[in-house]
């Protein structure tokens, strides 16, 4: 978090999941009060997972990634407070690694401060957020599945069909994203620092 400077020597673009979660929370918190929530990233299996079962100290991560849904921890919650301080310690994060090659689905459940907020209010806020973050945030109105978003370089594709209100003030949301979006944000960071270097040289 904080302004970029030519004096920076180590920078990070976070992760695909952290970026998607932060975009969602930033957009919604600008319109509504959010008390707390939880996030589950339904995530393609990764290069550090085994393709076949083996004898390991972590019984879950030593199982075949290509054959299992594997509950896992996620560090997005640790970084969230650095990026959006208002949410420090307020969002529980976890992951399910599933046997697909790429891509993720973000399942976020939020406890809203105002019980009057509806599912359509959330969808409208995300449509407005997509309009103000072109090329980074998108909204999907059709009943899609993951293969429909492969090749999309946006970091968050909010699925309006997945927004549900439960009880008085709980909102469930679904959003799609894939690693291409994270690669695009890495390029954005490189371009930003390239511009800063040119300004300093001038």
Map each language-model feature to its residues.
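N-terminal Rossmann-like NAD(P) cofactor-binding subdomain of oxidoreductases
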Residues: 1-62, 165, 186-192, 196-200
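A general structural signal for well-ordered alpha-helical segments in protein cores
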Residues: 21, 77, 105, 183-186
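C-terminal substrate-binding/catalytic lobe of Rossmann-fold NAD(P)-dependent oxidoreductases
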Residues: 33-36, 41-170
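NAD(P)-dependent Rossmann-like dehydrogenase/reductase catalytic/cofactor-binding core
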Residues: 150-202
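A generic structural signal for alpha-helix starts
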Residues: 19, 114-117, 181
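Hydrophobic alpha-helical scaffolding
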Residues: 14-15, 69-71, 176
């Amino acid at each position: 978090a904080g302004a970029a400077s030519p004096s920076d020597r180590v920078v990070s673009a976070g992760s695909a999941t952290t970026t998607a979660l932060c975009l969602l929370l930033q957009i919604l918190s600008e319109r509504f009060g959010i008390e707390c929530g939880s996030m589950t990233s339904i995530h393609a299996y990764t290069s550090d997972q085994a393709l076949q079962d083996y004898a390991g100290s972590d019984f879950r991560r030593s199982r075949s990634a290509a054959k299992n849904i594997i509950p896992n921890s996620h560090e997005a919650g640790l970084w969230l407070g650095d990026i959006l301080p208002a949410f420090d310690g307020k969002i529980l994060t976890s992951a399910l690694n599933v046997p697909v090659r790429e891509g993720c689905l973000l399942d976020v459940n939020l406890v809203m401060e105002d019980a009057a907020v509806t599912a359509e209010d959330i969808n409208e806020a995300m449509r407005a957020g997509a309009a103000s973050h072109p090329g980074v945030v998108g909204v999907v109105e059709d009943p899609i599945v993951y293969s429909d978003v492969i090749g999309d370089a946006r970091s968050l594709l909010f699925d309006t069909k997945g927004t549900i209100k439960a009880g008085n003030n709980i909102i469930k949301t679904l959003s799609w994203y894939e690693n291409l979006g994270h690669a695009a944000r890495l390029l954005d960071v490189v371009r930003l620092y390239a511009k800063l270097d040119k300004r300093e040289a001038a």
